[in-house]
Amino acid sequence: MKDVTIIGGGPSGLYASFYAGLRDMSVRLIDVQSELGGKMRIYPEKIIWDIGGIAPKPCHEILKDTIKQGLYFKPEVHLNERVVDIRKKSERHFEVETEAGEIYTSKAVIIAIGAGIINPKQLDVKGVERYQLTNLHYVVQSYRRFKDKDVLISGGGNTALDWAHDIAKIAKSVTVVYRKEDVSGHEAMKTLVTDLNVKLCPKTRIKYLVGNDDETHISEVVLEHVESGDTHAVKFDDVIISHGFDRCNTLLSETSSKLDMHDDCRVKGFGNTTTSIPGIYACGDIVYHDAKSHLIASAFSDGANAANLAKTYIQPDANAEGYVSSHHEVFKEANKTIVNKHLY
């Protein structure tokens, strides 16, 4: 039996993993995705400004460090596993069951599943799956791949406009199509992309995709006006789909441990990450309380709070907080290496 099972491998879950290790707890970390990082993997090239004391840098750099930190104390990690139930058998005895039927036991549970299981909405046209490993994209991993390319973006929200704005600086051309009369993204961003000569095509959708000779790459896109039905084919090097996300939070609605909920998607909790069930803590975007802010920085704070409370739940006579890291014995040898690197 582990001390704590953390469900969710985003920033809050990863920091909870680190801090629980700092508090000398054994940790199990479970995530439904094939990689750790949560929603941060959706926008790897975005520049993150709002983490205190961290200089602005691309999200993928912050994510790399966050994962490294979360794994510092060598938690037991399970990827590609969807949790379907949390059962409180008794005080300090929980069972976490996965879709595959695996049952993991621990003394406490931390729920850090963000907005739930997030998957980009797929383009609904015939044969789309054959292009997903080549030049059809649902997530922009690197802007550099679009250098000097003709790029089509389908979607009129903030994410689509953000991608259009950044890609237009290096691409040969960027075209944005969306079904409505106007984009739903911020008006200021619409002005910015227009200034970069991004072509905006309202009331337009992708009718179907035309592949190359071996059907491995998209060579043309047939666009359709949603009102007139008129179509025309345009050659593009890459196609990006930004139609929003499908979210799944069935764990919270179907779990045996009936937590008080704020709405269908979020746990009703408190600033210290406690929930209506002792021994279960919620941190990051999944928890709601009056003082909640949805920032990566606050996700880190939530993770530390959840780990501290799990520690005192498991061991009531434990200190409410851990030692500050600069004085912690566990980092003594690592600190020597860091000091030598920076001073000599």
Swiss-Prot record:
Q: List the disulfide bonds.
A: none
Assigned EC number: 1.18.1.2
- Could you tell me the keywords of this UniProt record? FAD, Flavoprotein, NADP, Oxidoreductase
Class of the enzyme per the UniProt entry, highest EC level? oxidoreductase
- Keyword Hydrolase on this protein? no
Query: Which intervals of the chain form a coiled coil?
Result: none
- Superkingdom of origin: Bacteria
Query: Which cofactors, if any, are listed as required?
Result: FAD
Please share the entry's free-text remark on the cofactor. Binds 1 FAD per subunit.
UniProt cross-references to InterPro entries, sorted A to Z:
FAD/NAD-bd_sf (IPR036188), FAD/NAD-binding_dom (IPR023753), Fd--NADP_Rdtase_type_2 (IPR022890), Ferredoxin-NADP_redctase_2 (IPR050097)
| Pfam families from the UniProt entry | Pyr_redox_2 (PF07992)
Which residues bind FAD per the record?
S12, D31, K39, Y43, V83, I118, D285, S326
Q: Reaction(s) catalyzed by this protein?
A: 2 reduced [2Fe-2S]-[ferredoxin] + NADP(+) + H(+) = 2 oxidized [2Fe-2S]-[ferredoxin] + NADPH
What family does the database annotate? Answer: Belongs to the ferredoxin--NADP reductase type 2 family.
Quaternary context: Homodimer.
What name goes with this protein?
Ferredoxin--NADP reductase
Organism field: Staphylococcus aureus (strain MRSA252)
